[in-house]
């Protein structure tokens, strides 16, 4: 009977769904509800991690330190966690977060670039933080290649390494193969995590498959609040885990209430599988491109699906949000020539 560490990402990945505009009252209410529901950890910060607030990624309503301080102040059970992308967030940012009460950090890189995480993982360990490696866009690397990247993060000091399906593009077999490869390649004491998106409507199924293959840490969010069609809906996953007899420690009804009463009313765009978010999973595109691509579509009169599919064809990855407008302009020029 598996025991699972459930990490909620409503207040970090969920930032993408509302353009990083959570108010302090909202995050405090959500964090308090999650804490009372006994989730193991709550991640807080700009959707693109510490110092992600920028023209390229989206300006946050508040600074990370304000969000973190507000959440850390109300937690009694859950760990306060955050995300850092090397090249965006710095060791200085990490130290500031730790001083405010962050106890755990995920250091995220593209699935072929684990080497850029070395400095930040080592710094996190020096701060006595729990630290996980976060291999994003996992569908763009083979299971064997991903396992080698995970071993690098393990060598730098990561306590856990995640298979991160940022595009929501993996099928269940794809998740199974990658989690199995990591579990076989890493030391027994190094944990494996699973983070998926719901773009192909496989958010819960893929999380379940991940656990079946040895993942211990599972990311999920209230009402699936996250980039694209969202993440694994935490209340649905908890219900499925209960049906399977898994130990996750969360209060199912409390999660249901928080999802419906606190999170859904904040969505200015429904977090769901629709023609745009389905196109993200179909094309294998970074889920947080959604709102940027919709803006470009509205500005230039190009079908957002065409933009997303072309981004996938060009193999654009997180950090290349500036290319979305370029793609829209190229498609517009092609239409005008036709």
From Swiss-Prot:
Gene3D superfamilies: 1.10.8.60, Aldolase class I (3.20.20.70). Keywords: Aromatic hydrocarbons catabolism, Lyase, Manganese, Metal-binding. GO terms for biological process: catabolic process; L-leucine biosynthetic process. Mn(2+) binds at residues 13, 195, 197. It is an enzyme of class 4 (lyase). Substrate binds at residues 12-13, 166, 195, 286. The record marks 12 as: Transition state stabilizer. Residues 4-256 form the Pyruvate carboxyltransferase domain. One of its GO terms (molecular function) is manganese ion binding. Its EC number is 4.1.3.39. PROSITE patterns: PYR_CT. The active site is at 16 (proton acceptor). It catalyses: (S)-4-hydroxy-2-oxopentanoate = acetaldehyde + pyruvate. HAMAP family: HOA. PANTHER family: 2-ISOPROPYLMALATE SYNTHASE 1, CHLOROPLASTIC-RELATED, HOMOCITRATE SYNTHASE-RELATED. Belongs to the 4-hydroxy-2-oxovalerate aldolase family. This is 4-hydroxy-2-oxovalerate aldolase.
């Amino acid at each position: 009977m598996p025991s699972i560490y459930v990490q909620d990402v409503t207040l970090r990945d969920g930032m993408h769904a509302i353009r990083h505009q959570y108010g302090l009252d909202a995050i405090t209410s959500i964090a308090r509800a999650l804490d009372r529901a006994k989730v193991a950890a709550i991640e807080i910060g700009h959707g693109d991690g510490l110092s992600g607030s920028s023209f390229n990624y989206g300006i946050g309503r508040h600074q990370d330190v304000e969000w973190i301080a507000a959440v850390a102040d109300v937690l009694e059970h859950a760990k306060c966690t955050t995300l850092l992308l090397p090249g965006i967030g710095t060791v200085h940012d990490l130290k500031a977060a730790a001083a405010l009460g962050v106890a755990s950090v995920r250091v995220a890189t593209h699935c072929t670039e684990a080497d850029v995480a070395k400095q930040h993982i080592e710094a996190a360990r020096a701060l006595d933080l729990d630290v996980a490696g976060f291999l994003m866009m996992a569908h763009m690397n083979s299971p064997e290649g991903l396992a080698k990247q995970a071993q690098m993060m393990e060598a730098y000091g990561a306590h856990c390494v995640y298979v991160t399906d940022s595009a929501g593009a993996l099928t269940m077999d794809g998740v199974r193969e990658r989690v199995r490869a990591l579990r076989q390649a890493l030391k027994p004491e190094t944990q494996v995590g699973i983070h998926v998106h719901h773009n192909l409507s496989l958010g819960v199924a893929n999380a379940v498959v991940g656990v079946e293959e040895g993942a211990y840490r599972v990311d999920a969010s209230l009402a699936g609040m996250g980039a694209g069609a969202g993440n694994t809906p935490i209340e649905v996953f908890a219900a499925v885990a209960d049906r399977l007899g898994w130990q996750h420690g969360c209060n199912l009804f409390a999660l249901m209430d928080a999802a419906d009463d606190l999170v859904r009313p904040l969505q200015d765009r429904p977090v769901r599988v629709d023609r745009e978010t389905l196109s993200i999973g179909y094309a294998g595109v970074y889920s947080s491109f959604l709102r940027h691509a919709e803006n470009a579509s509205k500005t230039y009169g190009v079908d957002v699906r065409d933009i997303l599919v072309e981004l996938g064809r060009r193999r654009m990855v997180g950090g290349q949000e500036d290319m979305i407008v370029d793609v829209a302009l190229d498609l517009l020029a092609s239409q005008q020539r036709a």
